[in-house]
């Protein structure tokens, strides 16, 4: 008890600056101890950082459909190999994916070998060195305790008034134990310093293994380059789409035929325009007049329908060949972004004259019928014009339409409900680009009043403005591009409010 109290008193006096005698050590010993402490701190940091490095490199994760866990680089290689094998029958470049995938898998095996060396050799030697330094710390604490006992007894003897043989004997024993532990501690520090070449050799072997790992990885990647991996690859041999129209007249240039991936459009507008001097219309057969009656609608569209159907058949055949050549990975080229235009029932209602159009609320059923009729193909253009003029003698003048706003025209009749109550209002679900002068250019969301249903594929209607009034823009549009207008639609409600007041 007295010995522990004396040791505590000695330690307190040294810490708080009391007059206590303390045994001093040599400069060589202090220098060696400082170097040993630096080694202990450094080796501990190296061990913790290398452990974290190996743990990150050795992370193995499995995909959702795989039970075995692999390195990320091995997963990458396996994915490339699977892609190449899947495209082996449909792509000439499948071997490229397989070559790169196998190289990545081999790099994964090299990484596993490198990590095995880190775990079994480098980190093992590092842990042994760290254990030796930590064992030295135990010897240091033992030496420090004996020093405190020795210094406490020395201070006690100096303060004693008379000599005591027992105190002197305890002092000699404490001195011997302190010198013994001091010698052991110093010898162990010297031994650890002599083992420094072994620690350096461990780092050199780590460097050599790193060079070996990266050199083999580089050789694998360069081997791909030497085998022509980096050369420019040819495009996949996809059969090109070619289109040919049946019986195209000589007066129509090839630039008037435009082919697109989703449809084929024959641009006939320039050839159907009237000649300014002779006032005659040129058509593929030189017999089609400028106006067409509804009775001969099917006869007039036979030639255009045949050409369009023939072109679409060629296009569908080419798309089918392309899909067969690409296998399962071919892109579905026949899927349009909007519904297909019903070309097989599309009437050819082309006209080159700007004719004033009544608002839908002022048009009678007779006007709508006459505006979309077609004469016989055997009749001459002049005779057909005279016939249509006699039938359409009730057409208003342009000034009567442009001077008065549509809202006032609606109110000039006592009961507009009788003319529009039997018709329906639709909203465009897709945008529509016209191909002839008789078709309306419409955007998604436009509201139209249906004037006439020509057939199941094409309707005639008048576009409504945002405030619900008639715009005077009348023409054809595909019926599968629109849906019935909702009763709570803002424009529809404005139209009903203006139309039924």
Swiss-Prot record:
Residues 390-402 have a biased composition (Polar residues). GO terms for molecular function: lipid binding; membrane bending activity. It is found in: Cytoplasm. The keyword Glycoprotein does not apply. One of its GO terms (biological process) is endocytosis. The modification Phosphoserine is found at residue 414. Keywords: Cytoplasm, Phosphoprotein, SH3 domain. This is Uncharacterized protein C19C2.10. It comes from Schizosaccharomyces pombe (strain 972 / ATCC 24843) (Fission yeast).
